[in-house]
A protein has these predicted regions:
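Solvent-exposed, charged helical/coil patches
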Residues: 1-47, 124-145
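Basic, amphipathic alpha-helical patches used to engage nucleic acids or provide basic targeting signals
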Residues: 22-28, 51-121
Length: 145
């Protein structure tokens, strides 16, 4: 059996991550699919978004690398989720801002959701917000060694 080098181990890890991201993109729910139609191809004020971006061991539903913004679209299974709080804390600690919307808000109030995203991207929303229909957490500035 050939020895595994660091390069082949890393490549295998990247391939698994890429495959998982691909599976997640293919299983988008209706709300995620509709929001993606608005975010793709720089349609929202020229910002480039990607789907299912790996950040550490987590995958962001949508992310704008330029603005370091993660957008999550949540179903009812996320209500009061400790897992999401840990995940959000990780992303914020690594310099990402995180905004979460409920599926229902994306489906029925899409324009308001888009306006909120634009406000964040334009820097008009500069503090944490926790409301019944969304949550926004500002990313921390990360100092690299």
């Amino acid at each position: 059996m050939p020895l595994k080098t660091a390069e082949t181990v890393m490549r295998g890890s990247r391939e698994k991550t890429t495959e998982r991201a691909r599976r997640l993109r293919q299983s988008d729910n209706d709300a995620e699919g509709l929001l993606w139609l608005e975010l793709r191809a720089r349609r929202l004020n020229g910002y480039k978004f990607v789907r299912q971006l790996p950040i550490g061991r987590y995958f962001a539903d949508f992310a704008c690398r330029e603005a370091r913004l993660v957008i999550e679209v949540d179903g009812s299974q996320h209500a009061g989720s400790d897992w999401d709080a840990v995940r959000d804390a990780y992303m914020v600690a690594h310099g990402w801002s995180v905004v979460r919307f409920w599926n229902g808000s994306v489906l029925t109030e899409r324009q308001s959701v888009l306006e909120t995203i634009v406000a964040i991207l334009d820097g008009r929303l500069r503090e944490n917000v926790v409301a019944y229909d969304m949550r926004f957490l500002m990313g921390r500035t990360v100092i690299h060694d």
